[in-house]
C-alpha cells in the first residue's frame, strides 16, 4: 500500500474510531468495566462529552403534540423601494377590469390608433400579436367581430415601436394572432 493511499484512508479510520466512542451511552461505566474498576483520568474525561444532553432533533420531536385548530395569520410582503398606500386608493377602485398587456420583441412596427380624446367609454380595438419581420397596423384589420370578452393583450416579437396610450376606463378587446414560418 502506498503512502498516498494510507493518508487518504486516515481520516476515514479516525472518523470510525470517534463515531464508535461517541455512540456509547455511558463512557465512564465502559471504562470501569474494561480497566477493572479504575476511574477514568481527568485528561480523558475532558476529551469525551459524557453529558446527558438530548439531541435537539429528538427533543423537538418529543415536544410536538397534536396541533389544535389554528387560523393563518395575514401576510403582506413588500420588496425593494415599493410604497403601498391601500387606504388612499380604496374609494377609486369601483369596477375593476384587467389592464392591457403590451409586449414587443424583434423587428416589428406596430401602430395602433390612439384614443386621446376618450374620457368615457369607447369601442374596444382588436388585439394583435406578430412574430417575425412584419409591419402590422391595427387599422387594416377592421371587420365584424362577434361579441366576446377577452383580456386585452398586445404581443409582438422583433424590434418594435409601440405608440399606444391606455386610459383607466376600458373594456377587453378581441385578440388576433399571426405567426410567420
UniProtKB/Swiss-Prot annotation:
Q: What UniProt keywords apply to this chain's record, in alphabetical order?
A: Repeat
> InterPro entries from the entry?
Organ_specific_prot (IPR024489)
The sequence repeats extend over 59-84, 85-110, 111-136, 137-162
Keyword Repeat on this protein? yes
Q: What residue spans carry the region label 4 X 26 AA tandem repeats?
A: 59-162
Q: In terms of domain of life, where is this protein from?
A: Eukaryota
Q: Is the keyword DNA repair assigned to this protein?
A: no
Give me the ranges of the annotated region Disordered.
94-181
Cite the record's tissue specificity text.
Answer: Expressed in stems.
Q: Which family does it belong to?
A: To organ specific protein P4.
Per its record, how is this protein called by name?
Organ-specific protein S2
- Biological source species: Pisum sativum (Garden pea)
The organism's taxonomy opens as: Eukaryota, Viridiplantae, Streptophyta, Embryophyta, Tracheophyta
Amino acid at each position: 500500500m502506498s503512502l498516498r493511499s494510507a493518508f487518504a484512508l486516515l481520516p476515514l479510520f479516525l472518523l470510525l474510531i470517534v463515531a464508535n466512542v461517541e455512540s456509547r451511552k455511558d463512557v465512564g461505566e465502559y471504562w470501569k468495566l474494561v480497566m477493572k474498576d479504575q476511574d477514568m483520568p481527568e485528561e480523558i474525561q475532558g476529551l469525551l462529552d459524557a453529558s446527558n444532553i438530548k439531541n435537539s432533533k429528538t427533543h423537538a420531536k418529543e415536544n410536538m403534540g397534536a396541533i389544535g385548530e389554528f387560523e393563518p395569520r395575514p401576510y403582506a410582503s413588500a420588496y425593494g423601494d415599493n410604497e403601498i398606500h391601500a387606504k388612499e386608493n380604496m374609494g377609486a377602485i369601483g369596477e375593476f377590469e384587467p389592464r392591457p398587456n403590451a409586449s414587443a420583441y424583434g423587428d416589428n412596427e406596430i401602430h395602433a390608433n390612439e384614443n386621446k380624446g376618450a374620457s368615457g367609454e369607447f369601442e374596444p380595438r382588436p388585439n394583435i400579436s406578430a412574430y417575425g419581420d412584419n409591419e402590422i397596423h391595427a387599422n387594416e384589420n377592421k371587420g365584424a367581430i362577434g361579441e366576446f370578452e377577452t383580456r386585452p393583450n398586445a404581443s409582438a416579437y422583433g424590434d418594435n415601436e409601440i405608440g399606444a396610450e391606455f386610459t383607466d376606463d376600458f373594456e377587453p378587446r378581441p385578440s388576433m394572432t399571426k405567426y410567420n414560418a
